[in-house]
Structures are given as structure tokens and as C-alpha cells.
Amino acid sequence: MDFKGSQTEKNLLAAFAGESQARTRYTFFASQARKEGYEQISAIFEETSGNEKEHAKLFFKHLKGGIVEMTASYPAGVIGTTVENLKAAAAGEKLEWGTLYPNFGDVAEQEGFPEVARTFRTVANVEAYHERRYNKLVESVNQGKVFKKDQLLKWKCRNCGLVVEGTEAPAACPTCMHPRSYFEVWVENY
């Protein structure tokens, strides 16, 4: 597969750059969430940052070296509140899965690069999940439901692992004394 001079080559580089920048932005957003007392949201930004790194690596591997010239625009320079960051992240993810990667996949298909088209399409599926998760977190923060729910649940301390039952997380962990920010709804997914 020789991409040299193709639009697919440019699209791969744009996707690589975009994913790399999203990864870094998400690490900044994770720090902000932690400062605001949202340990789980911070961890979700960090997890998503790792996903973006892997997406960047997939696009990078397709390129196979060389120099590619292109002009592109990327969001820069703003770290807002956790809610603002979640909204910005959701918008970026929506652009990727809703427009960018489907279009890039179509171009790759038309130019005879079905493997690259498949990569764009499967990564788009992940980005759709990221957008849904970010939007759900915005809703949870805005409704004051990060640490308080309408039903009885189990809450797990992310620091020491204590699991307690209640409609809201304790103000502090009775075991390790870490603040409420370290609690998340406990889910057994194994």
C-alpha cells in the first residue's frame, strides 16, 4: 500500500495529530477534574487519554514514515471547569465519529485502502462511546448526581477499596479518611 501523495495519507496524519492532541488535552482536563474533587471523572479522562494514544498509534502505523505536508486546525489553549472540559471533549468526539472519520473512511475506500477505511470506521465507533460517556458525566455533574443518587447503591472508595451502601457517598471514607471525591458507584463487571 503506497499512500504517498494521496488524500488518505493526509487524513491519516490529520487523525494522528488530532488524537495526539486530544490525548494531551485530556490529561490537562484530568488534572482540572481532580482539582475540583472529581477523582472518577479525572480517571475517565486519563483512561480516554490512553484510548486516544492507541488511536494515534493505529493511524501512525499506517503512515509508514516519510514527510507529509498539510494544513489543519486544532483546539488549543483553554482549560475550563470540569463541565466545560467535558462538553468540549464531547464536541470533539462527536466531530470525529460523526463527520471526520466516516469521511476519511470513505476517501480511503475510494482510493483503494480498505484496511485504513476499516481503522477509521472502528475508531469512530469508540469515539461515539466517548461522546456518550462525556455527555452523561455532564448531566451527572449538572444534576448534582456524581456523589448522590436516587436509589440505594454501593459506593466504593477508589483509594482503599471500602464498599459502603447508601443513596450518597460518605463525606469521608470511614477507613482511610479520604474525602468524598474518592468515591464512585461500585459496579461488578466481572
Regions found by a protein language model. Name each.
Residues 1-190:
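Non-heme di-metal
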